[in-house]
């Protein structure tokens, strides 16, 4: 049995978003073929993602300087706990699906907050004298990224958000990557052929993901 984490970052309702619509079709087909797998769904706009703020940094600095964790305030402790829950959730899974859309040639801020959360030290990586090192077990992990670019900036965005997420996931130990890029997220402003081509590829990926 595999554990799949399905992460969306799109403020639109599903019927107004190509990425959410196609992503859900992928998920339905995946579950039809893999009913025994466990799926966890995370909506970065709906679910309150803890950002790495000054309270969080203060806790890290104090722990690094040798201070007792018991002196951390309840508010600081709650923030750290929320970050660790997200990182542990990521660590426990072995398949990841990210459904995102473009905002100013990159991701919405909520997605970067999530990447910061899963990248905190201890659950997913640790610092060594030479560099940071992934702490995920050696088993095969794979990811699928469904991303809607702005139609007039399609080429440039392939080099920004998609490459960034691939680099982060590779560092964390995810070695198998797939990406399906859409030219725009608006269902009413797309050619039927381009949409069906993306849909066909996602359904094909669901058979072997």
Locate each region found by the language model.
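A short, structured loop/turn motif at beta-sheet edges
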Residues: 31-34, 137-141, 172-173
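Helix-loop-strand module that forms the ligand-binding subsite of alpha/beta enzymes
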Residues: 75-163
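Residues at the starts of beta-strands that form the adenosine-phosphate
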Residues: 3, 38, 141-142, 176
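Short histidine/acidic/glycine/proline-rich micro-motifs that form metal-
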Residues: 11-14, 150-153, 186-188
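Hydrophobic/aromatic-lined pockets within catalytic cores
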Residues: 27, 31, 119, 123, ...
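Glycine-rich phosphate/pyrophosphate-binding loop and the adjoining helix
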Residues: 28, 155-209
